[in-house]
């Protein structure tokens, strides 16, 4: 099959009839811009059934009709025909040549013809189904459609794949099957309704027929069954009474036992409370004693420490005294030896002196007095000299002390200076370190603040990314949902529009007339008028038979239509001929609340139908309710019919019609019109939402990418800041440690300075004290030396006198005196030493007594120390013992608490158990009382049934018997009058019911067959689609590799689990680039990808002929040649007709013709290639 020719007449710029022949292979259509080349493509789309004038670059239907030009009248119609070679029977028509025609008149009426025979648009669409040819197929690629393919939604791309898969016819069959299924469902509902109604009638009559016979049987059965039940129940009740009495005693015993246990538990709990209180008191008492013991132990330990210290001091003092006594013993022994020696020497000298005594007595007396004076002076001088020596020694000691202290003072001063230098140096270091630490700390805080801001920003960005992603996902989901809704609504709208176009829902006669093609038919009344929805019921109730009247131009057209119906035996219908209608308008002048007006005034339509509206609706008044209608009728205020908003009709003669019907045909047509309007608004709104959502999604995607880039930068910045913070933290810790060390050093140095200053002050005080001592000593020495000097003068005088006497008394005297003096001296010495010895003895005795006393003191202190230690140990032992007692008490208290807790649980459980036991006891008492009452009632009932023979009822069947008894009672109570004639009536109804049931089963079987067919079609659709998808996917990858060099192409099914709503996305991956969606490609890349996609489809299923409008416009020369080479490969399977400006395309074409336009009259013409070349050259020069 191929396209032999296109015939265009009055379509757009083709004001004159043109006939364009096409050959096989590649044909190029060329011409200047604006010459009308693309109108040829629009004509092809239009004849194939394009309903959207926007897609063929027109605003409304009249735009496709030639509008005229200079000295050229406008055309009254536009007509396009496709002449197709069908020798291979590619199309399902038994003709070698097929002619497809579409014609539109200036009135807007469309005509479709196949081989010059009138047809319907649906038949043309069905003819081309699954051929790749059609208004939306891939065989007609208009201007910009290449890029539109790339920018198509996944569902639109899926539709292209479906066309290539050849499943459009299957989808159409499925739609048809679904319609059949819907009709079957309607028929099934009707049959079910009649069947249910028949079943109800049958059941009613059946009950009446059986009623009389059943009544007595049921009554007797009821009495016998009742007595048997009563006897069995009585036996059961008496048995239950005995059993429950036993249970009652058991429950009563259980209550007593539980109460006794509860009482014991409560008693024990009270005892535990008392014991715990005693334990607390005992613990408080022990705590009080322990506190006193701790105080006593503390005091004893302090006292012991003092005693030990005193003991050590006494021992040291005793040791010193004992050493001193030994020293005194040695000294006494020496003194005794000296006394003995002096006494011996005295005795020896005394013998000599006796001899000289007489001679010397006189001299002695003289000299005695002088010697006494001398001795006194000598002793005085000696004592004073000794004092001077002692003072000199003291002075020397003081001087030595000064020298030592001055050295120590100098050393302390040097030490203080050194310490001060160290302190100054340390302070400087600390200050510098603190400055550095503060700097590091400020840097650290700054970086931390920077990190916090960065983290906050990062967190904000992450939250934003999450929110944006959610928003994008939500938008994508919403868009998919909107697209699904839009497709569903559009599909539903198209179906409703097709139903409207096909006049579905009208009476058969009306429908056949409308589809007959008879000229002069305007349409059905209901389709040509408009009114507010609230008047629907009123209009339908008032003129139900007129709404499907057909409006025709004149009575001749009406006659033709009636003849058509008569000839075809298609039924009857009414016609409203515009030339015979006589308006019948009644006026209503009264002003009454609730009157909405004449129906003719409430309806809108074309002015040409005003006569029809006045004729049909001029005598009909619409009011709010029936009260207003009857009031107007009674007052004779209106001579026509009156209808209410709820559909009650009051005729002019007083007949009132009302009620509610099921949905009528008219109502369904009303509903369809409303639904079409609603769906149109919904589709427009959904498309707007899809566009708006896509724009928002794109904006959010850009924002998301910006935020992601910023997050990457922030992550790097965060890592850098954290590293800086870690380094600064280490520096700060190091500096802090250094500051702490320096502070410790400073404190240590300060303490050292303080100690050195104290020593310095102490040494200075000692020096000052020593200077004072030296000064006082020197004064004392000076005073003593003056006294010694005076005494020595006196002593010299005395000695001089003695010397004078001694000279006089010679040597004897001297010897006598010397001996005497020696004896005296010896006696003094002996006396002195004896006194010293006595003093030493006394000192020894004194120190011995002290030693004895100290020994006693030591013994007492040691005893005291031992006593104190004993007391401490004793008190500690008591303290520890009482602590153990406290632990024992704590353990006892814990045990009591644990016991109390367990007993509390037991108490709660016992209380609950006791309460439940009491409840059970009370309930069993109630049960026993109820059983007794039941026994009494049963005995009374049995007394009433004495004469009745009782059925034997087993206990296990008692419940079912009672159910049976209740059923019998209900049946008997429901008995009414018995209709004996109902049996025959029931037989007739049963036969009718069986017939309808068989018919219902046949319809159900048909429904199953249709459903199985739909399932089979679905499976076939799925299988063919996926096979096609896989082949085209492979082909697309191959074509991308061949046409776009080293480029990978892939198709991807979105939402594959939902076949009806799934879509297909196109992805490409250029060499050295990431896989990316087509929206990110350049214009040239998009064109090449689209061409690769189209070629991939051709590889799988080439279209018999293909129109391509400037498909290579965005391609360079190389890619254009590549494209033409691919097209050449398909010329054995497909015919290509290209609209082009490209020279390479023209060169590769098998045939070529041109299109030019006469600008004055605006008519396009077909010209030869040579002429079009000349025109193109002229246009190029002019430009």
Curated annotation (Swiss-Prot):
A Gene Ontology term for the protein's cellular component:
cytoplasm
Any one Gene Ontology molecular-function term assigned to this protein's record: ATP binding
List each copy of the SMC hinge domain by range: 519-632
Does the UniProt entry include the keyword Cytoplasm? yes
Example GO BP? DNA replication
**Keywords on this record?**
ATP-binding, Coiled coil, Cytoplasm, DNA-binding, Nucleotide-binding
Kindly list the positions annotated as binding ATP.
Answer: 32-39
Q: Which domain of life is it from?
A: Bacteria
Annotated coiled-coil positions are 162-483, 666-1019
For the keyword DNA-binding, the answer is: yes
| Database matches in SMART domains | SMC_hinge (SM00968)
Its localization reads: Cytoplasm
Q: What is its main location?
A: cytoplasm
Q: Name one Pfam family in it.
A: SMC_N
Its assembly, as annotated, is: Homodimer.
* Function of the protein: Required for chromosome condensation and partitioning.
The similarity annotation says: Belongs to the SMC family.
**How are the domains described in the entry?**
Contains large globular domains required for ATP hydrolysis at each terminus and a third globular domain forming a flexible SMC hinge near the middle of the molecule. These domains are separated by coiled-coil structures.
Name-wise, this protein is Chromosome partition protein Smc
Taxonomic lineage: Bacteria, Fusobacteriati, Fusobacteriota, Fusobacteriia, Fusobacteriales
């Amino acid at each position: 099959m191929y396209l032999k020719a296109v015939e265009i007449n009055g379509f757009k710029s083709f004001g004159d009839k043109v006939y364009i022949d096409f050959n096989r292979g590649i044909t190029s259509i060329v011409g200047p811009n604006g010459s009308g080349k693309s109108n040829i493509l629009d004509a092809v789309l239009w004849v194939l059934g394009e309903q959207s004038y926007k897609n063929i670059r027109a605003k409304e239907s009249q735009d496709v009709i030639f509008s005229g030009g200079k000295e050229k009248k406008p055309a009254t119609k536009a007509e396009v025909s496709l002449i197709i070679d069908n020798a291979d029977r590619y199309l399902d028509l038994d003709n070698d040549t097929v002619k497809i025609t579409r014609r539109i008149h200036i009135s807007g009426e469309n005509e479709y013809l196949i081989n010059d025979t009138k047809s319907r648009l649906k038949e043309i669409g069905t003819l081309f189904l699954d051929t790749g040819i059609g208004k939306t197929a891939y065989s007609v690629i208009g201007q910009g459609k290449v890029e539109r393919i790339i920018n198509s939604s996944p569902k639109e791309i899926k539709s292209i794949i479906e066309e290539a898969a050849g499943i459009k016819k299957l989808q159409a069959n499925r739609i048809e099957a679904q319609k059949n299924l819907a009709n079957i469902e309607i028929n099934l509902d009707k049959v079910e309704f009649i069947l249910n109604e028949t079943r109800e009638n049958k059941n009613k009559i059946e009950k009446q027929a059986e009623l009389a016979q059943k009544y007595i049987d049921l009554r007797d059965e009821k009495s016998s069954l009742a007595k048997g039940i009563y006897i069995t129940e009585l036996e059961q009740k008496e048995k239950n009474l005995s059993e429950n009495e036993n249970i009652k005693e058991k429950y009563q015993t259980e209550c007593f036992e539980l109460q006794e246990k509860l009482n014991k538990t409560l008693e024990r709990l009270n005892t535990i409370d008392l014991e715990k209180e005693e334990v607390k008191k005992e613990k408080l008492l022990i705590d009080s004693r322990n506190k006193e013991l701790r105080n006593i132990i503390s005091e004893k330990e302090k006292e012991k420490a003092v005693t030990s210290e005193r003991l050590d001091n006494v021992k040291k003092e005793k040791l010193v005294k004992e050493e001193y006594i030994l020293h005194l013993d040695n000294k006494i022994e020496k003194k005794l030896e000296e006394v003995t020696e002096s006494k011996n020497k005295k005795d020896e000298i005394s013998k000599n002196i006796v001899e000289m005594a007489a001679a010397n007595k006189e001299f002695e007396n003289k000299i005695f007095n002088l010697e006494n004076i001398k001795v006194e002076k000598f002793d005085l001088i000696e004592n004073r000299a000794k004092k001077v020596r002692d003072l000199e020694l003291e002075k020397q000691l003081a001087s030595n002390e000064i020298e030592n202290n001055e050295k120590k003072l100098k050393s302390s001063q040097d030490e203080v200076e050194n310490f001060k230098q160290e302190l100054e140096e340390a302070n400087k270091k600390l200050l510098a370190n603190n400055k550095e630490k503060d700097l590091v700390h400020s840097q650290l805080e700054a970086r931390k603040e920077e990190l916090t801001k960065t983290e906050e920003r990062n967190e904000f960005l992450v939250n934003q990314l999450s929110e944006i992603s959610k928003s994008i996902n939500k938008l994508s989901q919403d868009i998919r949902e909107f697209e699904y809704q839009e497709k569903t609504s559009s599909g539903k709208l198209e179906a409703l529009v097709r139903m409207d176009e096909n006049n579905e829902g009208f009476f058969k006669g009306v429908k056949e007339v409308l589809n007959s093609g008879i000229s002069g038919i305007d349409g059905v009344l209901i389709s040509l008028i408009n009114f507010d929805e609230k008047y629907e019921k009123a209009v339908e109730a008032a003129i139900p038979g007129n709404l499907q009247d057909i409006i025709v131009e004149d009575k001749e057209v009406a006659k033709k239509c009636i003849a058509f119906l008569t000839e075809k035996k298609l039924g009857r219908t009414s016609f409203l001929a515009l030339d015979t209608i006589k308006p019948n308008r009644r006026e209503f002048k009264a002003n009454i609340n609730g009157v909405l007006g004449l129906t003719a005034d409430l309806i809108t339509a074309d002015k040409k139908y005003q006569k029809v509206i006045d004729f049909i609706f001029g005598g009909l008044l619409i009011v709010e309710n029936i009260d207003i209608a009857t009031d107007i009728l009674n007052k004779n205020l209106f001579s026509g019919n009156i209808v209410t908003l709820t559909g009650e009709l009051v005729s002019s003669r007083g007949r009132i019609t009302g009620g509610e019907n099921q949905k009528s045909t008219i109502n369904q047509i009303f509903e369809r019109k409303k639904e079409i309007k609603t769906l149109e608004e919904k589709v427009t709104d959904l498309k707007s939402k899809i566009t708006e959502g896509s724009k928002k999604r794109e904006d959010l995607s850009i924002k998301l990418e910006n935020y992601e880039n910023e997050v990457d930068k922030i992550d790097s910045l965060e890592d850098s800041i954290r590293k800086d913070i870690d380094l600064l933290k280490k520096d700060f810790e190091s500096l802090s440690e250094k500051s702490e060390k320096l502070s410790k050093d400073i404190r240590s140095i300060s303490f050292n300075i303080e100690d050195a200053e104290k020593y310095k002050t102490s040494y200075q005080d000692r020096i000052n004290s020593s200077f004072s001592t030296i000064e006082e000593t020197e004064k004392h020495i000076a005073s003593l030396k003056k006294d010694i000097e005076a005494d020595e003068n006196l002593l010299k005088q005395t000695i001089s006198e003695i010397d004078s006497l001694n000279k006089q008394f010679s040597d004897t005297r001297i010897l006598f005196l010397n001996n005497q003096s020696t004896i005296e001296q010896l006696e003094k010495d002996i006396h002195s030493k004896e006194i010293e010895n006595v003093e030493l003895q006394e000192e020894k005795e004194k120190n011995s007594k002290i030693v004895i006393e100290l020994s006693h003191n030591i013994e007492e202190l040691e005893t005291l120390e031992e006593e104190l230690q004993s007391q401490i140990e004793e008190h500690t032992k008591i303290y520890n013992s009482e602590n153990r007692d406290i632990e024992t008490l704590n353990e006892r208290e814990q045990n009591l608490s644990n016991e109390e807790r367990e007993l509390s649980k037991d108490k709660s459980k016992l209380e609950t158990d006791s309460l439940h036991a009491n409840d059970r006891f009370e309930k069993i008492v109630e049960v026993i009382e109820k059983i007794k009452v039941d026994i009494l009632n049963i005995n009374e009932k049995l007394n009433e049934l004495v004469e009745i023979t009782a059925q034997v009822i087993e206990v296990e069947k008692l419940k079912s018997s009672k159910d049976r008894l209740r059923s019998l009672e209900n049946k008997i109570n429901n008995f009414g009058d018995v209709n004996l004639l109902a049996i025959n009536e029931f037989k007739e109804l049963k036969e009718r019911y069986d017939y309808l049931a068989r018919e219902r089963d046949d319809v159900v079987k048909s429904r199953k067959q249709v459903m199985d067919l739909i399932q089979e079609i679905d499976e076939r659709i799925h299988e063919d689609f996926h096979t096609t998808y896989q082949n085209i996917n492979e082909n697309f990858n191959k074509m991308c590799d061949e046409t776009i060099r080293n480029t990978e192409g892939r198709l991807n099914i979105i939402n594959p689990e939902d076949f009806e709503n799934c879509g297909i996305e196109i992805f490409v991956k250029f060499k050295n680039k990431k896989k990316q969606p087509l929206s990110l490609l350049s214009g040239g890349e998009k064109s090449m990808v689209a061409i690769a996609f189209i070629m991939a489809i051709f590889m799988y299923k080439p279209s018999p002929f293909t129109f391509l409008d400037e498909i290579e416009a965005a391609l360079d020369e190389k890619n254009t040649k590549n494209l033409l080479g691919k097209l050449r490969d398909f010329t054995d399977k497909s015919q290509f007709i290209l609209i082009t400006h490209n020279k390479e395309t023209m060169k590769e074409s098998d045939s070529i013709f041109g299109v030019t336009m006469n600008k004055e009259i605006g008519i396009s013409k077909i010209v030869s290639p040579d002429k079009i070349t000349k025109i193109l050259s002229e246009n190029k020069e002019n430009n």
